[in-house]
Every structure is written in C-alpha cells, then in structure tokens.
Amino acid sequence: MQTILVLTTFLSAWFLAVGFDVFWNVPSQQCKKYGMKFVPLLEQYSILVNKEDNFKGDKITIFYESQLGLYPHIGANDESFNGGIPQLGDLKAHLEKSAVDIRRDILDKSATGLRIIDWEAWRPIWEFNWSSLRKYQDKMKKVVRQFNPTAHESTVAKLAHNEWENSSKSWMLSTLQLGKQLRPNSVWCYYLFPDCYNYDGNSVQEFQCSEAIRKGNDRLKWLWEESTAVCPSIYIKEGQLTNYTLQKRIWFTNGRLQEALRVAQPKARIYPYINYSIKPGMMVPEVEFWRLIAQIASLGMDGAVIWGSSASVGSKNHCAQLMKYIADVLGPATLRIKENVARCSKQACSGRGRCTWPKDTSVIAWKFLVEKEDYDFYLGDIECKCVEGYEGRYCEQKTK
C-alpha cells in the first residue's frame, strides 16, 4: 500500500507536465448500499473519480440524450420526441433547457474536468444514417416533400441531405458552444466522435477507416474545430472476443485511434472510451484491458475514460466483482502504464512530452508500456509529443 501511495504522489506531480489522465465514468455509487466504497480504491491507482463517487461531478460529467436540453430523436416504436429530427426541433427552447441542465449538473462555474455529450440516436453525416437509422433520412425526405410536392425524387434527396446536415450542425455546434460558454475551464467533447465503422479486415491497413468514412469525418471539420477534446470509443465487445483474433482486435483499436489523431485539432485532448464489462457478470479479459490502455498511451494521447453501465453495478455480486477487478486488473494496469508514460517522458522527452512510435506499422509499441519498471526505452524509435512551449524530436528546444 505504501508503495502505491508514494508512486501516486510522484505521478500526480509528473502528470502536471506530461499528462495521462484516466477518468472513472461508472455509476459505482450504486454500490454504497452494499457498504462498498470505490473512491479510496480508485484513488490508490491515480484514477480520476468524482467526489463522493457521484456520477456527475467535479472530474467528469456525461450528458445522456434525455439529460441535456430537448434532443430531437425517434424512439424504438417510431415515436417522435422533440420533433424527431433536428429540422423539426425547437433549438431555442433546447438551448434554454440545456443551460439549466449544465448549471445543475456542473455547479462550479470555474470547474475543470471532462464533459461529454452523448448523442447517439442519429448521425450528423447524412449517409452515415444507415440500417435502423435510415428512418431519419425517410422522415427528413417527407418534410422536404411537403414543401416541394412536385420536385423530382433526386431533388428531394439532395435537399434532404443538405437540410439534414445543416440542421444537425446547428444543433450539435450550438450545444457544444453553450457548454464551453457556461463552463469554459472544462474540456468538452461528443462521445463516439470520430467513429470509424471498421468492423472487418485482414490487415492493419484494412482496419483503417475507409476513404468514404474519412471523407464523411472531414465534413465534420466544424465539430473538430470547436471541440476541446475528442472521445472515440474502442470498447471490447463479446463478438470481437469470439470472432476476431487478438491481432484483429489490435488492428480494430488502432484504426479508431488513428482516426481520432487525424481529425483532432493540435491542442484538443484525446480521451478514448474503454470498457471493463462486456455484459453484467462478464469482465474484459485482463490482457485486453492492459492492451486497450497501452495502445492509447503509445500514441501519445492524453488519457482514457473507463465507462460502465448501471447494470454492471446492479447487484451486490456485480459490485463485489468490480471491486476485485479493480484491485487485480484495472488498477494495476492503469498505474503501471501511467508510470511508464512518465518514465518514458523522462528518458526520451526531457520530461516535456509523451513518447510516440510513429513508425510502428506493426502496432506493437504498446507492449513497451506494459513492461515492468526496469525496462529502458529505445530512443531511436521514439518521437515526442511535446507540451506547449517546447519542440524538437525529444522536446529539447523551447518554441521560438
């Protein structure tokens, strides 16, 4: 215990310079009724958890669809809520209610921390609304047809496409700008952006985002320019464990992380979402959890968000299972990798940046960050991602 506390103190000071923050976005306060307290355990491993284990708080707040404003969407039974689509929603009323919601859930006007907007019902890029989301395209076309009853079908489709993307942009952008205005010291992102939809492939290249997806994500330039963080998802799902080899899972993760690096603004932070629970009672395998955190860190990213559902802490047994998993897997993995990020920074980056391995075409550099403390990093493969004010391969020069 003493070793952990000493190391935690060292890391807290070191991360002021190089930064690798791991946030706890799990409703583990549900476990208090069973006498289980997660905050002391998580803090032993330098995991950022809200005071009193509140789900929304000083370190992190996520706004689900029903918790921020008047989000227009279509329900499972095709029932329209708040207009159903952005074009029919009341944006002014939405922003007024959003302001109330933000002030309620983030009380401190000067609060720092990470704030995430989780809107998943529809996608702002028209052609990304496929499969079950095609209902949004259909509803948008019906609205356009009402105002253009004699227009050719191709004209209706083009108008619907343009109006959808313009309206979606207005809703997402104005909501993000409102959050930044009300809580300017916090870092803001949309969950699951960017996505890659890279579900199949037989090589590292084939698991990269396709050209069509990259072009679609490029049309979200307005989102990347306004976001102070990007928060993609690299969750491990049960189907991946049964249908993918370990190598394919590595490539899948890499493809999504590479797209986040590609679209993020230079000063934007990157906090990918990872999971510890695949379904209630089934935890992410130990080697997979270590790999997820290490892959994020090996690309010089700012940290990660650990997410869990209310169902994953919905019983005494599940709470006990999570507490054991933190002590055995999640905590040690987080602490080791945070420590190695700091150590590599000191060895290679003059303590002024994070190590990256830009020529890592085989996606193996993450393994360096799971090694034990006596491992020496080979500087010849490393380029440093420098903190503001420094530059050079090893952050050895002050910015002119």
From Swiss-Prot:
Expressed in which tissues: Expressed by the venom gland.
Disulfide linkage: 31-319, 196-209, 344-355, 349-384, 386-395
Catalytic residues identified in the record: 120 (proton donor)
Positions of the EGF-like domain: 340-396
Catalytic activity, as annotated: Random hydrolysis of (1->4)-linkages between N-acetyl-beta-D-glucosamine and D-glucuronate residues in hyaluronate
EC number: 3.2.1.35
Entry keyword Endoplasmic reticulum: no
Glycoprotein keyword on record: yes
Keywords: Disulfide bond, EGF-like domain, Glycoprotein, Glycosidase, Hydrolase, Secreted, Signal
Glycan attachment sites: 129, 166, 243, 275
Gene3D superfamilies in the cross-refs: Aldolase class I
Subunit annotation: Monomer.
Primary role: Spider venom endo-hyaluronidase that is able to degrade purified hyaluronic acid (HA) and chondroitin sulfate (CS). Has no activity on dermatan sulfate (DS) and heparan sulfate (HS). Also increases the dermonecrotic effect of the dermonecrotic toxin (AC P0CE80), when injected in rabbit skin, supporting the hypothesis that venom hyaluronidases are spreading factors.
Family indicated by similarity: Belongs to the glycosyl hydrolase 56 family.
Name assigned to this protein: Hyaluronidase
